[in-house]
C-alpha cells in the first residue's frame, strides 16, 4: 500500500518550481500515513506526481515513480501485482527490468498492450502512468476496486487532480471542499438501489471506476473512461459440471489466492473474527508458516461465540491469537477521537464496526511495529450468499427451497427504498415534518435497477455495500501504515462464481455453502459450519450504539454543535434548534435506529465542517491503548462472567417466564415528539421516570402487553401467532438492560 497523487494542467500550462512542487508536497503530506517510508516528486512540463511509499516488496529497489530506461514512461502504483513473477517471465528478455519490485512490470505491460496493460495482472492496484511520447496520462484501478483512486476535473476542463484519498485532493487549492448533501441523502435513504456509482460525498469529486481506465490526452485535454474487465456472464449452452467440481475449483483458487497475497518482504498478520471467512484465510496462510492473529474481544463477540471460535481456530493451527479487549461501557473515546476516525475514513457511513477495526489496527501496529500487511476475510459474504439472513430474516438453517423467495424480497426491498426518496416514509419523514431537516436539501425519487434473475439481484444488492467495506478497510488500515489484503476478491474467484450454472445457485449460494464445503478439509466441522453472525448486530447492537450516543453527547454535545456548524456553512439541511431537540429526545428515548440515524447525520455535518475548515484534524486524545487479555482468564473475571450470562440467554427457552423488572412498566406517550418513532408510542419506563427504550415495532409492543409474570415465552408467542425470531433482538436487549427479567431467576434471587 502506498499513496499516489498528482495533477495536470490540461490547458498545457507548465508546472513551476517553488509553486507547484509545494502543492505536490502538501498533497503528499496529507496522506503521509499511507507511505511513511519514502517520498518522491516528479514534475514534467504540465504534469506533476507525488508518491508516498510503504515498503513491502523489494525494500531497497522499489522506489517510485518507476521509469522505463529510455525515460518514455513513468508510473506510480498503489497496491500489489501478485503475479509479477509470471508476468516477468512472459515478458521474456525484451525489456531490461532493473528491480524485484512487483510494480515494475506495469510500464512494460503498457508498452506491450497499451490500454490492455492490466489484463494479465492479478492484484489490487491504483495506477497513474505518464506516456511522454504519446502525451498521455492513464489512471486505472484493479478489477474489484480494492485500491482507491479519486479525481477532480475542473468545470472549465483546464485542471485534473487525482489522489488516493480525499485529504490529498483537498490539499490542492483548486479542488472544492464542499460536502454533497444531495448524494449523501440518496446513499443514506436508498443504500441498496442498484445500479449506482459509489459517491465520494463531495461535490466535483469522483472515483475512477473499478476495472476501468481514465485515459487523459495531454494534447487536447480530452478525458475518456474505458472498462477493461466485467464480471462474466455464463455462456448459453455451456456444459454443466457437478456441484463437487465447482466446490473443488473454488477451494483451489482460494488457496492460490491466499498464497499470492502472502507476497511480502515484511511481517504480516490476519484479523481472525471467528467466522468461517477469516478462519479459512488463516488456515491457508498458516501453511506458509506462523503468523499473528488478532481478534476483538467484547460483550458482543463473547455473546456471538466469535471470540471463542477465533481462539480455537488459532490454537488448532498453532498460531498466536491476540484477543484485544474492547469495553463498550469504558472505552473512553472522546469527540476528538471520533473526529480522528471520521477524518481517516473520509465518509459518513461510519459506526461502531469501523471504530473497533480502526483501533484493532492500532493495537496490531503497537504490538508488532514492523507489521505492514493484514489479511482479511472481506468480500466473501457479498459473493457467496453470506447476507441471506439480513435479506430474508434470521433463522437457524437455510435450505435450497428458500432460494425462490429471495428474488421476490430483493426486488421489493429495492423498490420500496427507492420510493422512500419520493415520500420519505416512516421515521425519515418525521425529521422533515418536525423541521429537523430542510426538505429542499433532499433529492427526488429514483427508480431501482432490475436484474434478470435471483443471483444477480442478490449480488448487485450487496456488492454496493462491498464498495463501502473496501473503502473502510483501506482507510482504517492505511491510517496506521498498514496494507489490508482481501483473498476472496481474486478476480479468478469472482469469474468462477459468476459462471456457476443457475441450477446450482440454490445449493452453493445459500449461506455460503460453496465456501463451507471447500473448508471441510481445512477446519473442524463446528467451525466450517458455524452460523453466520454479524459484528455488532443482533441483541448486542444496542450497547454499541449507546456507546456511540455517549460520544455524541460528550463535552456538552461538541460533535452536535460541529455538525450544525458544518451544515450551516455548506447549505446543509440541519435546522439548528430542531436538530438539538432531536439529539436530546433521542437521549431520552434511546433506540438503535434513532441513534444510528442521529449518528449518520452528525457524521455528515462534521465531515462538511472538516472540509470547509481546510480539512484538518487536530490529533486530539485517543482512547487508552487497547488491552490484550487471555480469553480463558478474562472469562473468569466479573466482566467475562457477565458476558457469558448474556451469551447463555441469547436464545431464551420457550419455557422461560418473562416479566417486568421491579419498578418497570409500560406507558403510552403521545406520538409526535421528535424522538418518538412514527410507528410506536409505547415505552418501557422505570419508576424514577426514565424512558428506557422506545418500542418501534407493533410486534414487540403486542408481546410486552401480554407479559403477566405467569405465562411462558412459548405460550405468549403461540397466543400471538409470532415466531421467536420476530422478538429475539428486543427481548435480548431488554433482558440485558434489566427492564425485563426471568421471573424464576428473580424469585430465586429474592429468596437467597
Language-model segments: residues:
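Short amphipathic alpha-helical interaction segments
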Residues: 722-733
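A catalytic-pocket lid/entrance helix-loop region that shapes and gates access to the active site
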Residues: 382-423
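Cysteine-centered catalytic environments shared across enzyme families
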Residues: 1-329, 337-340, 344-345, 372, ...
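Short beta-strand "wing" residues that participate in macromolecule-binding interfaces
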Residues: 278, 484, 529, 741-743
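Short, Lys/Arg-rich nucleic-acid/phosphate-binding segment
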Residues: 745-748
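Extended catalytic-interface subdomain
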Residues: 376-379
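Adenosyl-5′-phosphate
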Residues: 1-4, 8, 116, 170, ...
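ATP-dependent adenylate-handling ligase core
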Residues: 299-364, 368, 385, 389-400, ...
Amino acid at each position: 500500500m502506498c499513496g499516489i497523487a498528482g495533477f495536470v494542467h490540461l490547458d498545457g500550462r507548465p508546472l513551476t518550481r517553488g509553486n507547484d512542487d509545494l502543492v505536490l508536497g502538501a498533497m503528499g503530506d496529507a496522506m503521509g500515513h499511507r507511505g511513511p517510508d519514502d517520498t518522491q516528486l516528479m514534475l514534467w512540463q504540465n504534469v506533476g506526481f507525488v508518491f508516498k511509499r510503504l515498503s513491502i516488496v523489494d525494500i531497497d529497489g522499489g522506489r517510485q515513480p518507476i521509469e522505463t530506461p529510455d525515460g518514455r514512461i513513468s508510473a506510480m502504483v498503489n497496491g500489489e501485482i501478485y503475479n509479477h513473477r509470471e508476468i516477468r517471465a512472459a515478458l521474456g528478455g525484451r525489456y531490461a527490468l532493473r528491480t524485484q519490485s512487483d510494480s515494475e512490470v506495469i510500464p512494460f505491460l503498457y508498452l506491450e498492450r497499451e490500454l490492455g496493460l492490466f489484463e494479465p495482472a492479478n492484484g489490487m492496484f491504483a495506477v497513474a502512468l505518464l506516456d511522454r511520447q504519446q502525451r498521455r496520462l492513464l489512471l486505472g484501478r484493479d478489477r474489484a476496486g480494492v485500491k482507491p483512486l479519486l479525481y477532480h476535473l475542473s468545470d472549465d476542463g483546464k485542471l485534473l487532480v487525482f489522489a488516493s484519498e480525499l485529504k490529498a485532493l483537498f490539499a490542492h487549492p483548486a479542488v472544492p471542499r464542499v460536502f454533497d448533501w444531495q448524494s449523501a441523502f440518496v446513499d443514506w435513504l436508498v443504500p441498496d438501489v442498484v445500479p449506482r456509482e459509489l459517491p465520494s460525498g463531495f461535490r466535483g469529486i469522483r472515483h475512477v471506476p473499478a476495472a476501468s481506465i481514465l485515459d487523459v490526452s495531454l494534447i487536447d485535454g480530452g478525458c475518456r473512461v474505458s472498462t477493461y474487465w466485467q464480471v462474466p456472464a455464463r455462456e448459453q449452452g455451456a456444459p454443466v459440471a457437478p456441484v463437487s467440481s465447482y466446490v473443488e475449483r473454488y477451494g483451489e483458487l482460494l488457496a492460490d489466492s491466499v498464497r499470492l497475497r502472502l507476497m511480502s518482504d515484511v511481517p504480516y498478520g490476519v484479523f481472525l473474527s471467528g467466522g468461517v471467512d477469516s478462519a479459512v484465510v488463516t488456515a491457508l496462510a498458516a501453511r506458509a508458516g506462523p503468523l499473528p492473529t488478532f481478534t476483538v474481544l467484547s460483550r458482543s463477540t463473547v455473546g456471538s461465540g466469535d471470540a471463542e471460535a477465533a481462539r480455537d481456530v488459532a490454537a488448532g493451527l498453532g498460531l498466536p491469537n491476540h484477543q484485544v479487549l474492547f469495553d463498550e461501557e469504558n472505552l473512553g473515546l472522546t469527540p476528538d477521537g471520533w473526529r480522528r476516525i471520521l477524518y481517516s475514513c473520509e465518509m459518513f457511513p461510519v459506526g461502531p464496526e469501523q471504530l473497533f477495526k480502526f483501533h484493532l489496527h492500532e493495537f496490531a501496529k503497537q504490538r508488532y511495529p514492523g507489521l505492514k500487511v493484514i489479511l482479511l476475510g472481506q468480500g466473501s459474504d457479498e459473493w457467496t450468499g453470506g447476507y441471506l439472513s439480513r435479506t430474508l430474516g434470521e433463522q437457524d438453517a437455510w435450505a435450497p427451497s428458500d432460494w425462490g423467495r429471495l428474488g421476490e424480497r430483493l426486488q421489493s426491498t429495492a423498490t420500496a427504498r427507492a420510493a422512500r426518496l419520493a415520500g420519505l416514509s416512516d421515521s425519515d419523514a418525521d425529521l422533515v415534518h418536525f423541521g429537523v431537516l430542510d426538505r429542499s436539501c433532499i433529492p427526488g425519487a429514483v427508480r431501482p435497477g432490475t436484474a434478470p434473475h435471483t443471483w444477480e439481484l442478490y449480488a448487485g444488492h450487496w456488492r454496493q455495500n462491498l464498495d463501502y467495506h473496501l473503502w473502510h478497510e483501506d482507510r482504517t488500515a492505511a491510517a496506521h501504515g498498514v496494507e489490508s489484503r482481501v483473498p476472496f476478491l481474486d478476480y479468478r474467484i469472482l469469474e468462477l462464481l459468476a459462471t456457476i450454472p443457475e441450477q446450482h445457485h440454490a445449493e452453493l449460494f445459500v449461506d455460503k455453502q460453496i465456501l463451507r464445503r471447500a473448508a471441510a478439509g481445512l477446519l473442524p466441522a463446528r467451525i466450517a459450519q458455524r452460523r453466520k453472525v454479524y459484528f455488532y448486530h443482533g441483541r448486542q447492537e444496542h450497547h454499541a450504539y449507546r456507546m456511540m450516543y455517549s460520544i455524541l453527547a460528550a463535552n456538552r454535545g461538541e460533535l452536535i454543535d460541529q455538525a450544525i456548524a458544518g451544515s450551516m456553512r455548506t447549505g446543509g439541511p440541519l435546522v439548528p434548534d430542531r436538530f438539538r431537540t432531536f439529539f436530546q429526545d433521542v437521549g431520552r428515548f434511546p433506540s438503535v435506529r434513532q441513534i444510528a440515524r442521529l449518528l449518520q447525520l452528525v457524521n455528515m455535518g462534521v465531515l462538511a465542517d472538516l472540509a470547509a475548515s481546510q480539512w484538518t484534524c487536530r490529533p486530539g486524545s485517543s482512547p487508552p491503548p487497547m488491552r490484550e487479555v487471555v480469553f480463558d482468564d478474562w472469562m473468569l473475571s466479573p466482566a467475562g462472567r457477565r458476558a457469558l450470562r448474556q451469551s447463555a440467554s441469547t436464545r431464551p427457552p420457550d419455557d422461560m417466564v418473562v416479566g417486568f423488572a421491579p419498578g418497570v412498566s409500560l406507558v403510552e406517550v403521545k406520538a409526535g415528539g421528535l424522538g418518538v418513532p412514527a410507528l410506536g408510542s409505547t415505552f418501557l419506563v422505570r419508576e424514577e421516570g426514565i424512558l428506557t427504550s422506545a418500542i418501534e415495532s407493533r410486534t414487540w409492543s403486542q408481546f410486552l402487553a401480554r407479559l403477566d409474570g405467569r405465562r411462558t415465552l412459548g405460550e405468549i408467542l403461540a397466543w400471538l401467532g409470532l415466531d421467536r425470531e420476530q422478538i429475539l433482538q428486543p427481548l435480548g436487549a431488554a433482558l440485558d438492560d434489566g427492564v425485563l427479567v426471568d421471573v424464576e431467576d428473580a424469585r430465586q434471587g429474592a429468596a437467597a
